[in-house]
Design a protein with these regions (language model features):
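N-terminal intrinsically disordered, cationic/polar leader segments
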Residues: 11-118, 123-132, 136-173
Length: 173
């Protein structure tokens, strides 16, 4: 745990009236916890959870087709990020050491086959405060990740291939 005993990790106090809204989902070998208020979802991911896979699973479980990922913070490891070059090809870079996730945003849509699809950009700070930012390909939670999602109840977004680039573009129904 990066030098911290697990019991030292602070847990956030929740007002009693909101505590009843918290849902704990046991999906196999891990527990994902979230709370929902209208269109807003706040999710907590725990050590070992991969961010993309967890958010896709949440979209499938809750059954939404369109959402904005408005913010995310935490501490992650085994990060793979990058950028799209001028030829439309992604260049990937690893950031394997535990790092602070200082900003995360993106969206959740569906593919043409109906699978949940996440598109996320983020910014990390390593332990020397060097910034690493770009398109997130993979990221595993090291301590915790707290992510806000705004579900667009009456919208539908579909990811479709774009010509000549390594990207699935958004189409709106």
């Amino acid at each position: 745990m990066d030098g911290f005993p697990l019991e030292w990790i602070p847990f956030f106090a929740v007002e009693e009236k909101f505590l009843r809204e918290v849902e704990i989902k046991d999906w196999g070998t891990r527990v994902m916890e979230h709370t929902r208020s209208g269109s807003d979802i706040l999710v907590r991911l725990d050590p070992g959870e991969e961010i993309h896979a967890s958010l896709r699973e949440l979209a499938d479980r809750l059954g939404f087709n369109a959402a904005a990922i408005t913010s995310g913070i935490g501490r992650t490891r085994e990060n793979l990020y990058g950028y799209m070059n001028s030829e439309g090809i992604y260049k990937r870079r690893p950031l394997d050491t535990p790092s602070e996730l200082v900003s995360l945003s993106g969206n959740i849509a569906r593919t043409e086959k109906g699978d949940a699809f996440t598109h996320i950009h983020c910014c990390w700070s390593d332990d020397d405060n060097n910034v690493h930012a770009g398109h997130m390909f993979e990221s595993t939670v090291h301590v915790v990740a707290e992510i806000h999602i705004r579900v667009m109840e009456h919208a539908s977004m579909t990811r479709c291939p774009l010509a000549e680039v390594e990207l699935l573009g958004l189409e709106f129904d």
